[in-house]
């Protein structure tokens, strides 16, 4: 069993959600949203340390958990880089605080695949017809996927990829793209359970129904 560090990204402002409080700190069934995933992740034997990337004003939210903190950056990759400075294990799991649902069997699958490949992300097949906008044409959805977190990547690959992104002034849209840009392989692990990211108020209602 490989040991990994967890970087929990909880620094977003949730502008699409339209709340004065960042969405990851809003209550879901009486508990701050971000703590739903942290409760499960921090209990897993594969996770040896937790780094929470958040604004210092919200650190008190995590007082019941043995975590360290990092300051969020302007972009997602900057926040990941900030958390990465405290990582002390050869593998990193990265998760969004706005995604409350975590399943231990999927973490096992991610880590098992990452150990063989180097970088993995949780994903779902696309059930809809997908079209390119300009020019309009239909895309083969069988070759596309919806990407979620957690994502798992070898620490040295993540460091190298983020360094190259900084050098080339690239913006990465997810974490395993750090492997892609340095020519390292990655693989998707398809989810077995419902996945939802809280982006809009109605998503909280859906999440409540799934609890």
Curated annotation (Swiss-Prot):
It comes from the Bacteria. It is an enzyme of class 2 (transferase). InterPro entries: IspD (IPR001228), IspD/TarI (IPR034683), IspD/TarI_cytidylyltransf_bact (IPR050088), ISPD_synthase_CS (IPR018294), Nucleotide-diphossugar_trans (IPR029044). It catalyses: 2-C-methyl-D-erythritol 4-phosphate + CTP + H(+) = 4-CDP-2-C-methyl-D-erythritol + diphosphate. GO terms for molecular function: 2-C-methyl-D-erythritol 4-phosphate cytidylyltransferase activity. The record marks 141, 197 as: Positions MEP for the nucleophilic attack. Pfam families: IspD (PF01128). NCBIfam families: ispD. HAMAP family: IspD. Belongs to the IspD/TarI cytidylyltransferase family. IspD subfamily. Catalyzes the formation of 4-diphosphocytidyl-2-C-methyl-D-erythritol from CTP and 2-C-methyl-D-erythritol 4-phosphate (MEP). This is 2-C-methyl-D-erythritol 4-phosphate cytidylyltransferase. It comes from Chlamydia pneumoniae. The gene is ispD.
């Amino acid at each position: 069993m490989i040991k990994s560090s967890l970087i929990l990204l909880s620094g977003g402002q949730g502008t699409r959600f339209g709340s004065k409080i960042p969405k990851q700190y809003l209550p879901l069934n009486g508990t701050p949203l971000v703590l739903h995933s942290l409760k499960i992740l921090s209990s897993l034997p594969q996770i040896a340390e937790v780094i929470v990337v958040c604004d210092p004003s919200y650190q008190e939210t995590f007082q019941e958990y043995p975590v360290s903190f990092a300051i969020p950056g302007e972009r997602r990759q900057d926040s990941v880089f900030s958390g990465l400075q405290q990582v002390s294990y050869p593998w990193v799991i990265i998760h969004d605080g706005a995604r409350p649902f975590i399943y231990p069997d999927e973490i096992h699958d991610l880590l098992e695949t990452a150990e063989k490949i180097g970088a993995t992300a949780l994903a779902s097949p696309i059930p809809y017809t997908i079209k390119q906008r300009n020019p309009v044409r239909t895309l083969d959805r069988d070759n596309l996927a919806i990407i979620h977190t957690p994502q798992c990547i070898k620490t040295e690959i993540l460091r190298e990829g983020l360094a190259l992104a900084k050098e080339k002034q690239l913006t990465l849209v997810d974490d395993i793209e750090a492997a892609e840009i340095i020519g390292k392989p990655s693989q998707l692990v398809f989810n077995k359970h419902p996945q939802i990211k809280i982006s809009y108020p109605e998503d909280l209602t859906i999440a409540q129904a799934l609890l």
